[in-house]
């Protein structure tokens, strides 16, 4: 018998699949997160959710709002754990200025796309997004269905020949 191949560990902690469904993603940027100790432990245990999170600007700094990190039962008991705390994003001044300028245009917002490990650091991928209308979502679904149908037709055509 052959040995099963071991899959490499994925570095992705949490994905925001809804963001790509609800928004056109214009630009993507990687940012660091300022976390507390109990948050790092919880993220390592996979208790993070970024489905409704977005970026706000306050006093020239960027903050991740709406991300939920559930505390572990074994985490530190002398610290009050707030799962939905606003977390500071670690970005260069140039990146901050660029994002702030782009996000102030009409119809644009900045949403969290994914949370992942990069070596020992937790990083969040944020995207400059513009909201989709209902018709745009329908067009995406039609396009996806046509691609599946086309692949099926091509597969059957290759089998016959």
From Swiss-Prot:
Localization terms from the record: Cytoplasm
**What does the function comment of this entry state?**
Required for rescue of stalled ribosomes mediated by trans-translation. Binds to transfer-messenger RNA (tmRNA), required for stable association of tmRNA with ribosomes. tmRNA and SmpB together mimic tRNA shape, replacing the anticodon stem-loop with SmpB. tmRNA is encoded by the ssrA gene; the 2 termini fold to resemble tRNA(Ala) and it encodes a 'tag peptide', a short internal open reading frame. During trans-translation Ala-aminoacylated tmRNA acts like a tRNA, entering the A-site of stalled ribosomes, displacing the stalled mRNA.
Query: Alphabetically, which GO biological process terms does the record hold?
Result: trans-translation
Which parts form a coiled-coil structure per UniProt? none
The identity of this protein, by name, is SsrA-binding protein
Q: Which PANTHER family match?
A: SSRA-BINDING PROTEIN (PTHR30308:SF2), TMRNA-BINDING COMPONENT OF TRANS-TRANSLATION TAGGING COMPLEX (PTHR30308)
Tell me which SUPFAM superfamilies the record gives.
Small protein B (SmpB)
Keyword annotations of the record: Cytoplasm, RNA-binding
